[in-house]
Amino acid sequence: MKIAILSRDGTLYSCKRLREAAMRRGHLVEILDPLSCYMNINPAASSIHYKGRRLPHFDAVIPRIGSAITFYGTAALRQFELLGSYPLNESVAITRARDKLRSLQLLARQGIDLPITGIAHSPDDTSDLIKMVGGAPLVVKLVEGTQGIGVVLAETRQAAESVIDAFRGLNAHILVQEYIAEAKGCDIRCLVVGNEVVAAIERCAKAGDFRSNLHRGGVASIATITPRERDIAIKAAQTLGLDVAGVDILRAARGPLVMEVNASPGLEGIEKTTGVDIAGRMIQWIERHATPEFCLKIGG
């Protein structure tokens, strides 16, 4: 097959691993910067061009689209879909997952357990928002934040009010969430491919922090997950329409809670920790599902 990887930086670990895994299985691979793609939207002859040339047909496309370029990145991916390329994750699913409010609403509707969460736009009634999620301590986040950026633990009501008031000055969308103390600064990242959790790690925050993101200095170790955690991770990914997802779970006293579903999970931390060839599993999924029948369906 001919496979395109949509990424702004082909030197990143995940891109290199996906390219290596695909080539090892005999596929042709090209890495394309989605922001350098431009599209001819034409009922007679739509096409995608890249750096002065019209791109050939690709059997499959692997989107590695950062949150900062979600709008144009998913537009480019959608054009590939309309031209009959199989997407490892569909553009509509990525857009759905990147919208934190929408994704939480969909997960809640499906009965998936979540931390108690409130979302507001520059709320005037700060005290009621805090009360709504059970009071302090609580976590305050910018809805648009990623990798632990724009996330604050407010341990008292006064601190929570101060943080929310500060965020209000940014004219931003604010997410307020109960703090799960028993998780002790750790979460479980489940890597879902299709209907299977292919690997799982526990990520724990560095001393003095509560954010477990590896980009923020968190430490990873192999996790043994329960059947319930496995099922909730798969259900969360499927609810958002994702074939590949990183599902972050908090271990609360009342059971596993889904904190976030990542549509473009990094592979470095979880592959190096577990030794699982996740990139290879993703390519195998493409091989099983990038059929002519599917491509004709999505292209239409």
Swiss-Prot record:
This is Ribosomal protein bS6--L-glutamate ligase. Mn(2+) 1 binds at D248, E260. Its cofactor is Mg(2+); Mn(2+). Mg(2+) 2 binds at E260, N262. Binds 2 magnesium or manganese ions per subunit. It holds the Pfam family Rimk_N. GO terms for molecular function: ATP binding; metal ion binding; ribosomal S6-glutamic acid ligase activity. Its EC number is 6.3.2.-. Residues 104-287 form the ATP-grasp domain. Mg(2+) 1 binds at D248, E260. NCBIfam families: PRK10446.1 (NF007764), rimK_fam (TIGR00768). GO terms for biological process: protein modification process; SOS response; translation. Keywords: ATP-binding, Ligase, Magnesium, Manganese, Metal-binding, Nucleotide-binding, Protein biosynthesis. Mn(2+) 2 binds at E260, N262. The gene is rimK. ATP binds at K141, E178, Y179, D187, R211, S212, N213. An L-glutamate ligase that catalyzes the ATP-dependent post-translational addition of glutamate residues to the C-terminus of ribosomal protein bS6 (RpsF). Is also able to catalyze the synthesis of poly-alpha-glutamate in vitro, via ATP hydrolysis from unprotected glutamate as substrate. The number of glutamate residues added to either RpsF or to poly-alpha-glutamate changes with pH. GO terms for cellular component: cytoplasm. Belongs to the RimK family. PROSITE patterns: ATP_GRASP. HAMAP family: RimK. It comes from the Bacteria.
